[in-house]
Amino acid sequence: GNAADLLLLPEAYLTGYELPISNEEALSDDNPYLKQICNAARELQLGVVVTAFTKGVERPQNSAYVIGKNGELLMKYSKVHTCDFADEACLESGSTFRVCDFAGIKIGIMICYDREYPESARILMLQGAEIILVPNDCGSMKPRLCALSTRAYENMVGVAMANPNGENAGSSCAFSPICWDNNGICVDNTLLMADDMSEGLFYADFDLSAIRKYRESEMLGNTYRKVKAYEPLLFGKITYPFLRENQSPID
């Protein structure tokens, strides 16, 4: 074997990315598929991040489950930034970002469109995340790969993304936060970069000891932020040119 600790699967893995879907059709947290994956995780001593459209309060949610090596459910996270400009307008957004402890490592989740907003990774970093995992299902990946590398750099967290293969898609990847060596010389922080068409299992190795040492000494993450200047980030008003037909200016 390859001695993997955790398997990251793409977005909506158990249900398929087929929308619209009703709350009745969405999976409950005690669905048999999740139980089977928990049993397999325990048998293989392998953590798993698996995804599905799940039952929400009124509408389905786009969710990820983090399963520990002993088959225990460590965390459920529901996508905050649903794609309200597309088919996901039928979904219910999650309300909070979450971090869990996986074998002594703090893990956070962003699902697909969450990664388009730097606030997602920033909040996970503030909550203690050391590694951010990104179940994904979309194309036009080139600028998004650059963004994921930047999220790793600016928050001093490892980032890994799993995306279904296909033309202009795929590109499952992983990035280290370590972007320069002890002498200040820039290093390539890319740990994994798959092509768009290859299908299979891809492996990335995060050196947690090196990452933790780096985080203790460098000046990014939550070191010298000037939070008093960030108040506009909390303003909900949407104005031109960002206001869309299905939005209210006070959303």
State where each predicted segment sits.
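Cys-nucleophile CN-hydrolase/nitrilase-fold catalytic domain and related Cys-dependent amidase chemistry
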Residues: 1-76, 122, 138-155
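Structural motif
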Residues: 5-6, 107, 131
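A generic "binding-loop/recognition-motif" signal
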Residues: 13, 70, 116, 197, ...
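Active-site/binding-pocket entry motifs
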Residues: 14, 83, 209-210
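CN hydrolase (nitrilase-like) catalytic-core segments centered on the catalytic cysteine
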Residues: 30-49, 116-203
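Active-site catalytic loop in hydrolytic enzyme cores
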Residues: 55-127, 136, 140-150, 154-157, ...
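C-terminal beta-strand edge segments of enzyme domains
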Residues: 99, 164-251
